Amino acid sequence: MMAGGNVRFLVLILAVAICGAASVFQPISDSHRSAALDVFVPVDGSYKSLEEAYEALKTLEILGIDKKSDLSSKTCENVVKVLQSSSSTLKDAFYALNVNGILKCKIGEAGPKDIVSQLQAGVKDAKLLLDFYYSVRGLVLAKEQFPGTHISLGDAEAIFRSIKSLSQSDGRWRYSSNNPESSTFAAGLAYETLAGVISLAPSEFDPSLIQSVKTGILKLSDSIQKYDDGTFYFDEKSVDASQGPISTTASVIRGLTSFAASESTGLNLPGDKIVGLAKFFLGVGIPGDAKDFFNQIDALACLEDNKFSVPLILSLPSTVISLTKKEPLKVKVSTVLGSKAPALSVKLTQALSSKSVDSSVINNQELKFDADSATYFLDSFPKNFDIGKYTFVFKIVLDESAHEKVYITEAQTKVPIAATGAISIENAEIAVLDSDIGSVESQKKLDLTKDGAVSLSANHLQKLRLSFQLTTPLGNAFKPHQAFFKLKHESQVEHIFLVKTSGKKSELVLDFLGLVEKLYYLSGKYEIQLTIGDASMENSLLSNIGHIELDLPERPEKATRPPLQSTEPYSRYGPKAEISHIFRIPEKLPAKQLSLVFLGVIVLPFIGFLIGLTRLGVNIKSFPSSTGSAISALLFHCGIGAVLLLYVLFWLKLDLFTTLKALSLLGVFLLFVGHRTLSQLASASNKLKSA
């Protein structure tokens, strides 16, 4: 029997390798919705801050997940508290209004007026870009949520110019006038802020101001980064290392879409960059970080609802086509959030083989449409379509010309495709040859689709030859990614050899005379195993062919010995043996009684010192009598006692570094109080002498 489990594992690994290399972009799907519930998890019915609450609620709202009822109670309490407090920061007020726009919290009548007044004061006093951003965008939110409140910026052009003064010549912006460094992330905030100023202005703006901003946007777009697959993104340079490509690109997209939403701006961006930015966020996959998750979904929502053009994404449920199962090619077209696309047609303009990129196997083939599954498919392939790697080139054509102003697609979408099938294995044989004349001594036909029981014998003067032919379903030569021949000695020593392929024939010749050292001069029975695998090969195999008895010369004394083999092949993955450390045997210690006597001899002088003090008496006449001097002297003696206590602790339990740290602090303390005490004693002595 063939080792089916190993073969299935081999095929799985190869399939994953191909799929992982494919540059295929998928729209937002149920996997994102499932992941969002794991990423945005509230604690006790709320989030740590209103900023986190807004990002979670906004993401879940875009994905169509209703969690408002679970979060509205505690979160609304925080919103009302912030909006009714005069001491709330502009940032807190901004995020409170964002959350309120989703949860529709019940705010008192005085709340809107108070928060509007606070935000208007924030606009007037703002010097930093973030202060302008929070206050202006907060007023825009307040205008949307409180229709009865009149909100406008009387000096809108002056505010616009103040914000514009923070711009740089390369299209990036500064956070403040005192900071010369510019930021791409700040540019996105600035465009959002300027869009808010335009929407709150009581009259039309000076066109030259808007044109100057549009010029800066064009310069900023020149700094956009690009991958080979047509993906575009913005990245921060140096001013704010905490902002990565995801947050920076999301900030710019929010700013551009907000600025373009104003009718007076007339802003437009090239379609290829819109699609490239969408592909960047779709290529991220599912972020594990909550901030990145929010930026991804929010940026895609901005691209899906913008004044430029809505990008359409072509995706494939699978990039592997089985010719054996006659599977059709399936293609889907949708918006970035997975919404239904308008009426259109999909053409397969080219199918380029990796073996011949100059000629196309398929040309201008229009795919059929299945309305029930909203899938475009190609259910038949030309006769010359063989297994292998291809690059399919698709083109999307909108049915109605009016949709061309609303939607945008790539001019060409290139997708790597792997066509798989069953490989024919023919003329498989194994033979023992004489080394001198190359004549066949024994030869066996093989059926590699199943295990065999071939029995061969050879000596060190002979050769072993294995040969077979691999052909595709169309009869073309096939060269597998992996073709290994293994000899396994009865002592479990293994040797692996690579089978080379030339044309249609794969062959391996082992000259045992040149392999005796590699085989460690081990005579005896060797099991023969052949492994053939390829990502395009559906019938990859691991076949046990049989065995061969080898008669090799005796091993010389200086020859390399075979490595020790475990009786259990999988024991290498089990627990390792415990490592036992052998320490140096401690030196012999003196008797306990002798140690105690020695300790007594050391302590004896100290005892004598104490006895002498009791006999002579302690002279404390010079101890300061005034309160300040007495405290300094007392602290000095306490510090000396603390040092002595530290020595004892060092002897008993503390390490050297901890002791030195404590001693340095005590030393500074003793230096201060000791100097003060000595100064006071010297002053008192001088007074006595002068008297």
UniProtKB/Swiss-Prot annotation:
InterPro entries attached to this UniProt entry: Ribophorin_II_2nd (IPR055375), Ribophorin_II_3rd (IPR055374), Ribophorin_II_C (IPR056790), Ribophorin_II_N (IPR055373), Swp1 (IPR008814)
| A GO cellular component entry from the record | plasmodesma
Q: In which pathway does it act?
A: Protein modification; protein glycosylation
What keywords does the record list, in alphabetical order? Endoplasmic reticulum, Membrane, Signal, Transmembrane, Transmembrane helix
Q: Which residues lie on this side of the membrane: Cytoplasmic?
A: 615-630, 675-691
Q: How far does the signal peptide extend, from start to end residue?
A: 1-21
Entry membrane topology: Multi-pass membrane protein
Q: Which Pfam families match?
A: Ribophorin_II, Ribophorin_II_2nd, Ribophorin_II_3rd, Ribophorin_II_C
Q: What does this protein do?
A: Subunit of the oligosaccharyl transferase (OST) complex that catalyzes the initial transfer of a defined glycan (Glc(3)Man(9)GlcNAc(2) in eukaryotes) from the lipid carrier dolichol-pyrophosphate to an asparagine residue within an Asn-X-Ser/Thr consensus motif in nascent polypeptide chains, the first step in protein N-glycosylation. N-glycosylation occurs cotranslationally and the complex associates with the Sec61 complex at the channel-forming translocon complex that mediates protein translocation across the endoplasmic reticulum (ER). All subunits are required for a maximal enzyme activity.
Q: Subunit notes for this chain?
A: Component of the oligosaccharyltransferase (OST) complex.
Q: What is this protein called?
A: Dolichyl-diphosphooligosaccharide--protein glycosyltransferase subunit 2
